[in-house]
């Protein structure tokens, strides 16, 4: 499923991401835009460590989920990676909450660091009635 911007913002807010670990909702929506273009079915393979990034927030199989093919996965979110590809973003949000608690915070997302960090992210939730 490809979410509309405000539709995603509403879903993320409902699931408790607004202000989670100190990051406003705009940061999460911005990250999703640049990681997956709001597409829950997005996957990207990383040849270097043979891992794959999954879903709307491109959560990585080396550390966070199990896809049955990534060597030495840690599976810190204790989920199957395919659960991160569903139209319902609950699993992605729950795992993202685990990711962001690490010392890097949202810095775990390269696209966030490049495109959202230190920027005014309020336009990402503008006119969404939130």
Curated annotation (Swiss-Prot):
One GO cellular component assignment for this chain's record is: extracellular region
Give all residue intervals belonging to the C-type lysozyme domain. Answer: 1-130
Keyword check for Secreted, yes or no.
yes
Enzyme Commission (EC) number? 3.2.1.17
Describe its assembly. Monomer.
Compartment(s) = Secreted
UniProt keyword annotation of Ribosomal protein present: no
Disulphide bridges? 6-128, 30-116, 65-81, 77-95
Q: Which domain of life is it from?
A: Eukaryota
Q: Which UniProt keywords apply?
A: Antimicrobial, Bacteriolytic enzyme, Disulfide bond, Glycosidase, Hydrolase, Secreted
One Pfam family this sequence matches: Lys
- What is the source species? Chelonia mydas (Green sea-turtle)
GO MF terms, alphabetically ordered: lysozyme activity
Active-site residue list: 35, 53
This chain belongs to the protein called: Lysozyme C
């Amino acid at each position: 499923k490809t979410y509309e911007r405000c539709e995603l913002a509403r879903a993320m807010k409902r699931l408790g991401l607004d202000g989670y670990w100190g990051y406003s909702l705009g940061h999460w929506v911005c990250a999703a835009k640049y990681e997956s273009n709001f597409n829950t079915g997005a996957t990207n393979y990383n040849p270097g460590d043979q891992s794959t990034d999954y879903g709307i927030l491109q959560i990585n199989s080396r550390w966070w989920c199990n896809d049955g093919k990534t060597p030495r996965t840690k599976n810190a979110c204790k989920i199957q990676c395919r659960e991160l590809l569903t139209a319902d973003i609950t699993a992605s949000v729950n795992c993202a909450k685990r990711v962001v608690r690490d010392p890097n915070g949202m810095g775990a997302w390269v696209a966030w660091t490049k495109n959202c960090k230190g920027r005014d992210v309020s336009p990402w939730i503008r006119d969404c009635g939130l």
